[in-house]
Regions:
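Short, charged recognition helix plus adjacent turn
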Residues: 10, 63-80
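Short alpha-helical "recognition helix" segments of helix-turn-helix
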Residues: 22-23
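DNA major-groove recognition helix of helix-turn-helix
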Residues: 37, 55, 63-66
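Recognition helix of helix-turn-helix/homeodomain-like DNA-binding domains
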Residues: 27-43
Length: 80
């Protein structure tokens, strides 16, 4: 079984926001956001940063990763 990479669905619930709301804010198809929420696909890191900003959380709060490579990329994105 594939491990969940992101926590977008969990954070949306915590913030009382919907997939549809997030899709509208990002100008994305709701089906795309749904795939992110079920971890069947992942947003790119730039989009993930936008999601974090919209939800008022740190980008790391959206990830379930102990993978140093992913964490390193997140640090680079945050600093740019």
């Amino acid at each position: 079984m594939m491990k969940d990479i992101n926590r977008i669905k969990v954070v949306l619930l915590e913030k009382k926001k919907t997939n549809k709301w997030l899709a509208e804010q990002l100008g994305k198809d709701p089906a795309t956001v749904s795939k992110w929420c079920t971890n069947s696909s992942q947003p790119d890191l730039v989009t993930l940063r936008k999601v974090a900003e919209l939800l008022g959380v740190d980008i790391k709060d959206l990830l379930n990763s102990s993978n140093p490579s992913v964490n390193e990329k997140v640090i680079i994105i945050k600093n740019n």
